[in-house]
Amino acid sequence: MIVGGDGAINDAINGIMTSMVEDKTNIAFGIIPNGIGNDFAKYWGLDEDNYKAAVDWIINRRLRKIDVGRCNYFDGEKHTSRYFLNAIYIGLGARIVQISDGTRRFWGIRELSFAASMFLLLFERKLYRTHLCINGEHIRGRIMTVCVGSARGYGLTPSAVPYNGWLDVSVIYRPELIQLFSGVWMLLQGRILNHKMVKPY
């Protein structure tokens, strides 16, 4: 049972996946949203303002098998890995998530917090040299951010479904300033994939 937000869910899923239990497919966990970020819970229609709905899910054993992603990376000292349920970000997206997690209490709304964080980083539009291989397609060059999601996360992979066996990927190239403003607006409307500087996979 997880009572908390996305951070608590992330810690729990990593605890489960790194445990000594051989058959992890039979492990069930319940979520009662009670954190700054409850993005994954909200995908299922659960909200911290209505904890009774989450309790009803658990009592009635409403089960759904979900996808778990794994990210292998080098942390500067050693190669390691982390598991995730929602989304991971590379580049500027990771910085935005870092800031928005700190401002969520002030803004209250996840999309608004994310958008506000983007505004705070308007002039940090740093590009990252990358080599991506997605579905056999090699992408080399400088990009602003990459989002890999099994669910919608902060809205950069809005079409992702956490139980279809697929990961959605959004590659975001560096937009001009006016395009960044329109991108924030499209993010809030759930239409970010229509932005010409975003390439979805």
Task: Describe the function of each predicted region.
Residues 133-140, 161-164, 171-201:
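ATP/nucleoside-binding phosphotransfer catalytic cores, i.e., glycine-rich phosphate-binding loops
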Residues 145-154, 160, 190-194:
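Phosphate-binding core of ATP-grasp and ATP-grasp-like enzymes
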Residues 1-25:
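N-terminal small/polar loop signature for handling phosphorylated ligands or for N-terminal nucleophile
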Residues 17-147:
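Catalytic core of DAGKc-family lipid kinases
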Residues 92-95, 151-156, 176-179:
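Short, acidic Gly/Pro/Ser/Thr-rich loop/turn segments
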Residues 11-13, 41-42, 95, 157, ...:
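Short glycine-/acidic-enriched loop or helix-start segments at secondary-structure transitions
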Residues 96-103, 167-176:
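Compositionally biased, charge-rich terminal segments
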Residues 4-5, 32, 173:
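Small/polar loops that bind or transfer phosphate-bearing groups
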